[in-house]
């Protein structure tokens, strides 16, 4: 395919135009008085949102250079959202301000590489200042405040704080759609994995279609079970004890499955068969987790254990197990606390050493299942459009609250960035590096200015006023008053603010040091010709 190439100022200005179109659409959502944006969908109802990354993802521009510029800024929003769950709009506003200021200097003859070095040194200093400003999250109220700001809803914030209080900072908080209106929180202690019963005949409550086993034995096997002959010796021992049995295996099929189902229907023996979660090595690891949690052993030929020779003391125990068609929840496993703690530390070490985001995410899930409980926030709404938007806001707010616990909180509303700019006095830079640092100093004002503008106020005046207030004080844009931000609960996780700045600076440096842009040449749409043997294609019928 043919390419088109632009150089120097033409290349940079093309990228900037694309970035400005995207940033202008996103920045109207910033702050408590930010507006919404409506996104048209190819199918179904349009989506209404004030989430920066959702808006950014929808923007596709026609001009090839502008398209590349918009894609670069999308990356800022996406990266910030992935890391911290919020701050996407702040990151976009910072990137736009940095690029605008930087390109002005490049056009005036500044050396782009020196500007880049100045920007990087300034951002490093400001990031350090933000972490120094950060206060540890100590109370449930602080978690509620930060989640409420992210979700723009105090009820959601309080529910997330309640969930984190119950399951701990490493616990799993999932968001599900509910058929009923409103919000509810469901807590499960112990482990939940997303595999349900193999046959609906195992259900003990036919109305809710779930199976509930009290004080069961738990057989954990890393193999398929199809022959009843292999299973019989163990079944007889469990039947003698009078306890129910949960079987977690790669699969249970054939006569083994039919024997279990027939005995369950006749009421002779209560059991449930469930497929093991995960695949390959991950399945092996998760079965090991379940074994440690329940005090059992994984029956696998790899370790010399065969099903037909297995004794009852290799089985795990739990206070209760609830199984639906989609998931299994093991409550209060009988494993030793020391062994569980050892396994948790082992998984933490694996997370530290892993360089794959996917592996790290899966290890984090395993850690959460072992170390914390599981909290499910069920969200309902009047329409499908509102439900999608609400669910997305809750998911972002959960990540935001976890970020607050991780690195602490700073004053929100763009105030932390303004007050972190005091570090510029200590930076000893010269020439174009100093110019690059100055671009960062000016860009730090952009989020507060935009919040003020969205609230119908004069941005420049507000920035000067806030700069002269005591540390931690700033503008409450919802009321127009100047307050102690942290005391009022107007806070941001330090991780969100830091990530927004670092990602914005990273893209800005790329913009400034770009000397050529190579893009696909737009294809002209071919005029539709007439079918063979027909007269001219533009005839009027």
UniProtKB/Swiss-Prot annotation:
Gene Ontology biological process terms, A to Z: protein refolding
GO molecular function annotation: ATP binding; ATP-dependent protein folding chaperone; isomerase activity; unfolded protein binding
Location(s) in or outside the cell: Cytoplasm
Superkingdom of the organism of origin: Bacteria
Keywords associated with the record: ATP-binding, Chaperone, Cytoplasm, Isomerase, Nucleotide-binding
Gene3D superfamilies named among the record's database cross-references: GroEL, GroEL-like equatorial domain, TCP-1-like chaperonin intermediate domain
Xref: InterPro entries: Chaperonin_Cpn60_CS, Cpn60/GroEL, Cpn60/GroEL/TCP-1, GroEL-like_apical_dom_sf, GROEL-like_equatorial_sf, TCP-1-like_intermed_sf
CDD domains: GroEL
Chain positions recorded as ATP binding sites: 29-32, 86-90, 413, 476-478, 492
Keyword Cytoplasm (UniProt): yes
Assigned EC number: 5.6.1.7
GO annotation, cellular component aspect: cytoplasm
Reactions accelerated catalytically: ATP + H2O + a folded polypeptide = ADP + phosphate + an unfolded polypeptide
Top EC category: isomerase
PANTHER family listed in its UniProt record: 60 KDA HEAT SHOCK PROTEIN, MITOCHONDRIAL
General function of this protein: Together with its co-chaperonin GroES, plays an essential role in assisting protein folding. The GroEL-GroES system forms a nano-cage that allows encapsulation of the non-native substrate proteins and provides a physical environment optimized to promote and accelerate protein folding.
Family designation: Belongs to the chaperonin (HSP60) family.
Assembly description: Forms a cylinder of 14 subunits composed of two heptameric rings stacked back-to-back. Interacts with the co-chaperonin GroES.
UniProt-recorded name of the protein: Chaperonin GroEL 2
Organism: Streptomyces avermitilis (strain ATCC 31267 / DSM 46492 / JCM 5070 / NBRC 14893 / NCIMB 12804 / NRRL 8165 / MA-4680)
Taxonomic placement: Bacteria, Bacillati, Actinomycetota, Actinomycetes, Kitasatosporales
């Amino acid at each position: 395919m043919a390419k088109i190439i632009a150089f120097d100022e033409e290349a940079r200005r093309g990228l900037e135009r694309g970035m400005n179109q995207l940033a202008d659409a996103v920045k109207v959502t910033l702050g408590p008085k930010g507006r919404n944006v409506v996104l048209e969908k190819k199918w179904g109802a349009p989506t209404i949102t004030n989430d920066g990354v959702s808006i950014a993802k929808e923007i596709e521009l026609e001009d090839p250079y502008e398209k590349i510029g918009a894609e670069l800024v999308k990356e800022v929003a996406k990266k910030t959202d992935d890391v911290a769950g919020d701050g996407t709009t702040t990151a976009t506003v910072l990137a736009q301000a940095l690029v605008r200021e930087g390109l002005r200097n490049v056009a005036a003859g500044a050396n782009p590489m020196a500007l880049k070095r100045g920007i990087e040194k300034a951002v490093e200093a400001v990031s350090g200042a933000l972490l120094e400003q950060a206060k540890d999250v100590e109370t449930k109220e602080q978690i509620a405040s930060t989640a409420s700001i992210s979700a723009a809803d105090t009820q959601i914030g309080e529910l997330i704080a309640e969930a984190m209080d119950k399951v701990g900072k490493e616990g799993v908080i999932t968001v599900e759609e509910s058929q009923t209106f409103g919000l509810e929180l469901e807590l499960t202690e112990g482990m939940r994995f997303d595999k349900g019963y193999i046959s609906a005949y195992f259900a003990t409550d036919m109305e809710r279609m779930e199976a509930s086993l009290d004080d069961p034995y738990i057989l954990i096997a890393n193999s398929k079970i199809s022959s009843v002959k292999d299973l019989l010796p163990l079944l007889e021992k469990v039947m003698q004890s009078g306890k129910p049995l949960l079987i977690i295996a790669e699969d249970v099929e054939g006569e083994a499955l039919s024997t279990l189902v027939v005995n369950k229907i006749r009421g002779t023996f209560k059991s449930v068969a469930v497929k093991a979660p995960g695949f390959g090595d991950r399945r092996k690891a998760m079965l090991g987790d379940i074994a440690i949690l329940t005090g059992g052993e994984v029956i696998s030929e790899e370790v010399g254990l065969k099903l037909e020779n297995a004794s009852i003391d290799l089985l795990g125990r739990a206070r209760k197990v609830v199984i639906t068609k989609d998931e299994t929840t093991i409550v209060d496993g009988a494993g030793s606390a020391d062994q569980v703690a050892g396994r948790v530390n082992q998984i933490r070490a694996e997370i530290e050493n892993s360089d794959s985001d996917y592996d790290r995410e899966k290890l984090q899930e395993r850690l959460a299942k072992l170390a914390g409980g599981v909290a499910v926030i069920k969200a309902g709404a009047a329409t499908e459009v509102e439900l999608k938007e609400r669910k997305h806001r809750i998911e972002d707010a959960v990540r935001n609250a976890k970020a607050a616990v991780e690195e602490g909180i700073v004053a929100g509303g763009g105030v932390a960035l303004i007050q972190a700019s005091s570090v510029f006095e200590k930076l000893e830079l010269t020439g174009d590096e100093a110019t690059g640092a100055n671009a960062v100093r000016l860009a730090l004002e952009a989020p507060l200015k935009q919040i003020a503008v969205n609230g119908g106020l004069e941005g420049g005046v507000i920035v000067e006023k806030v700069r002269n207030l005591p540390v931690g004080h700033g503008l409450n844009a919802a009321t127009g008053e100047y307050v102690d931000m942290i005391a009022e609960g107007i806070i941001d996780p330090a991780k969100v603010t830091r990530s927004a700045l670092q990602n914005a600076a990273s893209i800005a440096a790329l913009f400034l040091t770009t000397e050529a842009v190579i893009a696909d040449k737009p294809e002209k749409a071919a005029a539709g010709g007439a079918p063979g043997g027909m007269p001219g294609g533009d005839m009027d019928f």
